[in-house]
């Protein structure tokens, strides 16, 4: 980008950078005295706050979030898990949680783009985001609510972890966090695989693109994929 090479973006983050760069170039072109503008930019000061601990950094980020956009429930869940790992598990899972969610956000971008390319109404909806997939995962792996809101999921996870903390069952906190991030990442991966298959498999294309599989069936369908039971011969 800095060399003026605007290559075709491959994911959501790259598309955002691409669009921002185009907008910046457009605005700069309208400035009459570019030298004065450059001198003004050089006077700007950037305040840097360095925090070596990944867990502490995320806790600070959630507390002083000022990016102009509210945190999604998925981001809040990530922060919650890192908080419990950081404070009660000697930071054992901080990096694992961070890596898992980094992958999850990338998988979501791929899922969203694939769904739109396949003309699936569910994924084309502007309101659809990673929180929707978090709901599907919750329905597939928890038994206490089959129509949870994103805020309900966050509260449920917080209640479970708080209960373990109160009883000082730190081994249960570790087991819960480990299982949750493993199944969550696997769930996002499986959904991406299903949509990728719809590009090459006629039956999957018909089910997802033409017939538009009901949103209520996604939790079951994706879980079957994670269990390797949703092969080409399986009848949905």
Task: Outline where the language-model segments fall.
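Polyanionic (Asp/Glu-rich) segments that form extended negatively charged tracts
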Residues: 4-236
């Amino acid at each position: 980008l800095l060399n003026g090479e605007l290559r075709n973006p491959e994911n959501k983050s790259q598309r955002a950078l691409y669009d921002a760069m185009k907008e910046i170039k457009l605005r700069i072109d309208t400035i009459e005295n570019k030298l004065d503008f450059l001198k003004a930019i050089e006077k700007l000061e950037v305040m840097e706050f360095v925090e070596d601990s990944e867990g502490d950094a995320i806790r600070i980020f959630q507390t002083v979030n000022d990016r102009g956009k509210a945190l999604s429930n998925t981001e809040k869940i990530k922060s919650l898990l890192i908080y419990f790992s950081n404070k009660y598990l000697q930071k054992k899972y901080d990096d694992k949680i961070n890596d898992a969610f980094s992958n999850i956000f990338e998988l979501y971008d791929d899922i969203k783009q694939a769904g739109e390319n396949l003309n699936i109404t569910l994924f084309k909806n502007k309101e659809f985001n990673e929180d929707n997939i978090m709901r599907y995962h919750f329905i597939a792996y928890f038994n206490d609510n089959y129509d949870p809101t994103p805020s309900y999921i966050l509260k449920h996870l917080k209640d479970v972890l708080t209960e373990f903390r109160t009883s000082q069952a730190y081994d249960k906190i570790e087991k819960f966090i480990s299982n949750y991030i493993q199944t969550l990442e696997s769930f996002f991966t499986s959904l991406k695989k299903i949509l990728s298959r719809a590009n090459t498999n006629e039956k999957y294309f018909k089910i997802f693109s033409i017939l538009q599989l009901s949103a209520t069936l996604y939790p079951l369908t994706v879980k079957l994929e994670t269990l390797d039971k949703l092969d080409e011969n399986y009848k949905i």
